[in-house]
Regions:
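Bacterial Sec-dependent N-terminal signal peptides
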Residues: 1-23
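Short helix/turn-capping signatures at newly exposed starts of structured segments
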Residues: 16-131, 140-141, 159-183
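Short, solvent-exposed loop/beta-turn-alpha elements that line the ligand-binding surface or hinge
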Residues: 154-155
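Short, structured protein-protein interaction patches enriched in aromatics and acidic/basic residues
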Residues: 135-139, 143-148
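Charged, low-complexity, helix-prone segments enriched in Lys/Glu/Asp/Gln
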Residues: 95, 150-151
Length: 183
């Protein structure tokens, strides 16, 4: 009886650890996919989830890239995956957009994090100034975070030529998009 209880406890602990690894973000890895995952593998990797394929044909004929939207059984949007090359199931992944707060870095940063969470927990590699957003790059995890400039000082809001530094981004600025790029 004790052996059965120990076996059940061990199984429970292992399954809990596996669940966490299904949502971890680290360099070259997002949950169950990695930098070497091919598009043709997505159906088997996400066999318990739902995949919406927006391939560059039909309604999406003018789309510049194929998109694979991953939803869980409760219809929650988890990820959107874009391959390096359109129409090639043997191609690897170029970009992953994170939609679920369950996907986190080892330091707890997720789609619901604010800029202060990113800057305190990860080394910021670069900051790009675009028309409406700031793009914050974190090379140690292949990530970039898009943050809306609407909460920034007015002098940054409508200019793209101004250099933006860490101190210029309000700490409570929320992440608009959490992207992983594997170029």
């Amino acid at each position: 009886m004790k052996n059965i209880l120990l076996l059940l406890l061990a199984t429970f602990i292992i399954s809990c650890n596996n669940t966490d690894s299904n949502f971890k973000i680290e360099k070259g890895v997002v949950g169950r996919i990695n930098i070497e995952t091919k598009i043709e593998q997505l159906d088997s990797i996400f066999s318990n989830d739902s995949i919406v394929k927006r391939i560059g044909e039909g309604d999406y004929v003018f789309s510049s890239s194929d998109k694979y939207l991953i939803f869980d059984k409760k219809k929650n949007h988890l990820l959107t995956i874009m391959p390096k090359q359109q129409h090639d199931p043997d191609e690897t992944i170029e970009t992953v957009q994170i939609f679920s707060k369950n996907f986190k870095t080892a330091k707890g940063v997720n789609i619901e994090s604010s800029f202060i969470d990113i800057s305190k927990n990860h080394k910021i590699s670069n900051i790009q100034n675009t028309i409406n957003n700031v793009i914050v790059f974190v090379d140690e995890i292949d990530a970039y975070f898009i943050i809306d400039k609407k909460n920034m000082d007015f002098k940054f809001q409508n200019e793209t030529d101004r250099k933006i530094e860490i101190k210029d981004i309000p700490p409570k600025s929320k992440v608009k998009r959490f992207m992983i790029g594997w170029n």
